[in-house]
């Protein structure tokens, strides 16, 4: 699906009509983009009540025949997900329904960058960033929030590390010298290094690493610029984001996040992961057909630091 797009670029129009079938696929992605103004499709939802020959008796008969899950999809027009999703689907659906009402005051890079609110004087802002590992299905992403949890800007796209660092610094300066927390694992270290050493940006978030050494009763500590993700703190920040979304303590406007949230599930070990991510082929190589969690991780980091939690503590092995 989508192979017709190059043909349409030379002229013509397209009407795509379907009942929702799953999430994260091409149709669902285009729908979410359309209601947020991110593409040229005009989203129209046609309800069964609009049909002149349908009444409540027809609906009840169909509901009995199809069952609740298929009724929701085929009759009510709801996108359904599979697996135990991390985020409350009622909350995510409410966010999706609000996308068409979101005001976007600036876009760049074909919609990869979206700004919703200008910086307000005297307001503290926070930027958390997830840095792409370079794999085909991996993106760099960031989110800008104020202390109250209102998201004022977001980005998700393919971008070299030096340009990503420049983009983060640009919006750090623009948003009142915001605290920037780039994930500093692996290739993310290059982004953090550029921010610190090339751009001389000083308002960086720091992680504290506790070094336990043999023969010493008192551990040593080391402050590391950027956000250092571990399996433990990853679960903590995702759990906090889930709770804040469920309790309406954070206002997310990012359509990329909503696309990812529908396919962000608990795996067999109860670990929150993007559906199909890190799945390995029979040959042992990582497959590139899974879904993404880049916007989710950027949001989780930003949400954590905007609460005034200025340092994350990591205990290093002996």
Enumerate the language-model features and the residues they cover.
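PAPS-dependent sulfotransferase catalytic core
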Residues: 226
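Active-site-proximal betaalpha loop/short-helix elements
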Residues: 229
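RNase H-like, metal-dependent nuclease domains and their acidic two-metal-ion catalytic environment used
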Residues: 15-16, 21-25, 39-40, 56-216, ...
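N-terminal cationic and glycine-rich segments that engage phosphates or anionic surfaces
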Residues: 53
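Predominantly extracellular beta-rich ligand-binding scaffolds that present long acidic/polar faces
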Residues: 232
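Signature of the SF2 helicase/ATPase Hel1-core->accessory helical subdomain module
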Residues: 1-50
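Acidic/polar active-site rim loop that often engages polyanionic ligands
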Residues: 219-223
């Amino acid at each position: 699906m989508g192979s017709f797009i190059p043909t349409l670029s030379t002229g013509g129009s397209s009407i795509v009509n379907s009942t929702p079938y799953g999430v994260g696929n091409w149709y669902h992605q285009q729908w979410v983009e359309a209601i947020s103004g991110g593409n040229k499709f005009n989203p129209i939802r046609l309800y069964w009540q609009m049909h002149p020959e349908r009444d409540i008796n027809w609906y009840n008969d169909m509901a009995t025949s199809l069952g609740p899950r298929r009724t929701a999809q085929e009759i009510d027009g709801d996108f359904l997900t599979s697996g135990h999703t991390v985020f409350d689907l009622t909350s995510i659906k409410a966010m999706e329904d609000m996308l068409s009402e979101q005001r976007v005051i600036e876009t760049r890079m074909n919609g990869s960058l979206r700004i919703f609110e200008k910086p307000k004087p005297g307001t503290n802002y926070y930027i958390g960033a997830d840095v792409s590992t370079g794999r085909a299905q991996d993106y760099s992403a960031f989110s800008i929030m104020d202390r109250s949890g209102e998201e004022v800007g977001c980005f998700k796209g393919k971008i070299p590390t030096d340009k990503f660092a420049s983009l983060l610094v640009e919006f750090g300066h623009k948003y009142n010298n915001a605290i920037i927390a780039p994930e500093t694992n692996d290739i993310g270290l290059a982004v953090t290094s550029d921010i610190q050493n090339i751009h001389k940006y000083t308002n960086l978030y720091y992680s504290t690493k506790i070094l336990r050494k043999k023969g010493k009763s008192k551990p040593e500590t080391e402050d590391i610029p950027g956000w250092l993700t571990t399996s433990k703190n990853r679960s903590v920040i995702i759990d906090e984001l889930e709770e804040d979304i469920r309790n309406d303590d954070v206002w997310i406007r990012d359509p990329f996040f909503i696309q990812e949230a529908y396919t962000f599930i608990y795996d067999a070990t109860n670990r929150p992961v993007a559906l199909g991510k890190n799945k390995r082929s029979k040959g042992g190589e990582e497959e590139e057909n899974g879904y993404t969690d880049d916007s989710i991780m950027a949001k989780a980091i930003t949400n954590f630091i905007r609460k005034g939690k200025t340092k994350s503590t990591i205990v290093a092995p002996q």
